[in-house]
């Protein structure tokens, strides 16, 4: 589990094809002295398992599933990545609960300066829009962010200079694809509201205003 508070801005050192999958090597200035084989490190929001490491790098294998569901398939040597080691019981919980399981790929649509901060708009796939809420949390390329406003599937974000400087956010431009992970609490709430009906659905939620009213959640 992670918090979405980025510890290092790393970069892709190499991308190798291994039997149809991919092996990544990531350069980082993280302290790697406490890393062990099999540890998890979030890389642009993707939970990767360490298979090898050194003082300033780590390597991980990536499955075809991850390549298809994340932006990882477009990474090349030199690509900047946000890096966070898995949290410890003693870690300050400064962000929100992040699993490292990417839900969808979004697209940056607007980038502009807003006083000293940066203003962004991100288009999220329609299927995850139901899990988003104004002032709620979302993980974008591994960064825990607060949704300022929401218009359908378009969410707006404001970032302070500190966050932009310590992450890959400074490289975001209109058209850039980003990894999105919704707040896991939204998924648990959906499951609780649906009850046994959740097991019957495969791809689409049937939560609606009438459903909430019928079950006593709206008056």
Residue ranges with predicted function:
Residues 1-219:
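Conserved loop->alpha-helix
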């Amino acid at each position: 589990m992670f918090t979405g508070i980025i510890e290092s801005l790393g970069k892709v050192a190499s991308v190798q094809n291994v039997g149809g999958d991919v092996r990544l090597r990531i350069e980082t200035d993280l302290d790697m002295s406490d890393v062990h084989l099999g540890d998890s490190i979030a890389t642009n929001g993707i939970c990767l398992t360490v298979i090898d490491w050194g003082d300033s790098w780590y390597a991980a294998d990536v499955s075809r599933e991850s390549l298809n569901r994340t932006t990882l398939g477009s990474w090349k040597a030199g690509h900047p990545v946000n890096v966070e080691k898995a949290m410890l019981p003693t870690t300050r919980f400064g962000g929100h609960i992040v699993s490292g399981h990417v839900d969808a790929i979004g697209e940056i649509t607007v980038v502009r300066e807003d006083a000293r901060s940066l203003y962004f708009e991100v288009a999220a796939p329609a299927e995850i829009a139901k899990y988003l809420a104004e002032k709620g949390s979302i993980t974008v390329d591994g960064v825990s962010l607060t949704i300022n406003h929401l218009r359908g599937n378009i969410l707006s974000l404001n970032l302070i200079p500190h966050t932009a400087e310590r992450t890959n956010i400074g490289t975001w431009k209109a058209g850039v694809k980003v990894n999105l992970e919704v707040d896991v609490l939204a998924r648990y709430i959906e499951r609780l509201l649906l009850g046994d009906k959740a097991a019957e659905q495969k791809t689409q939620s049937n939560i609606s205003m009438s459903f909430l009213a019928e079950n006593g959640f709206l008056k």
